[in-house]
């Protein structure tokens, strides 16, 4: 399992690189990477385990964040509905956003990142809806439509695979500026 000491911090060149495509079938090393990325999220979202291991809670973790420049990320969006189901959970490999809404969305609280220790205030404009194509750990192709928070989380993680950090999207002169029609997500 990854610990906070394993998370690469802002300033490390791997966070600014274009990650390499992952080949199938997955090597044992890539299978372990996928397992460890998801395990971090599962453990970090359990308050007792998070405290025990000194983790910061996360909803996404990309391979470059642990020093591996490959197009792989884990996403575990916590349940918001009473049924207890996550709106999106998977290890996404070689993900591509194949369509996106014109409608922009942003989190009211801004975004954070396990690789960025400082608070960077401001709205991070993203697409409110996306269609995502990716492969899972078994090499099966998936295409899913996501909106609101799950769409934002996936865009954040995919940015990591292309050497982009969330604060690159913030308007430097007016960090809290937004279009009138931007959807603000709690």
UniProtKB/Swiss-Prot annotation:
Keyword presence, Repeat: no
Active-site residues, as the UniProt record annotates them: 157
One example GO MF annotation: metal ion binding
InterPro entries for this protein: Peptide_deformylase (IPR023635), Peptide_deformylase_sf (IPR036821)
Gene Ontology biological process terms, A to Z: co-translational protein modification; translation
Class of the enzyme per the UniProt entry, highest EC level: hydrolase
Keywords: Hydrolase, Iron, Metal-binding, Protein biosynthesis
Catalytic function, reaction form: N-terminal N-formyl-L-methionyl-[peptide] + H2O = N-terminal L-methionyl-[peptide] + formate
Free-text comment on the cofactor: Binds 1 Fe(2+) ion.
Organism domain of life: Bacteria
NCBIfam families registered for this protein in UniProt: pept_deformyl
UniProt name for this protein: Peptide deformylase
């Amino acid at each position: 399992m990854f610990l906070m000491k394993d998370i690469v911090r802002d300033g490390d060149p791997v966070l600014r690189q274009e990650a390499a495509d992952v080949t199938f079938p997955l090597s044992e090393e890539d299978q372990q990477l996928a397992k460890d990325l998801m395990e971090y999220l599962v453990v970090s979202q359990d308050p007792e385990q998070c405290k025990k291991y000194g983790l910061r809670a996360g909803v996404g973790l990309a391979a470059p964040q642990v020093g591996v420049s490959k197009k792989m990320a884990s996403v575990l969006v916590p349940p918001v509905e009473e049924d207890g189901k996550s709106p999106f959970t998977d290890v996404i490999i070689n993900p591509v956003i194949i369509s996106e809404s014109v409608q922009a969305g942003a989190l009211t609280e801004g975004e954070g990142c396990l690789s960025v220790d400082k608070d960077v205030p401001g709205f991070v404009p993203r697409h409110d809806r996306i269609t995502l194509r990716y492969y899972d750990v078994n090499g099966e192709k998936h295409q899913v439509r996501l909106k609101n928070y799950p769409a934002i989380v996936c865009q954040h993680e995919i940015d990591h695979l292309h050497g982009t950090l969330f604060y690159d999207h913030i308007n430097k002169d007016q960090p809290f500026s937004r279009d009138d029609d931007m959807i603000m997500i709690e």
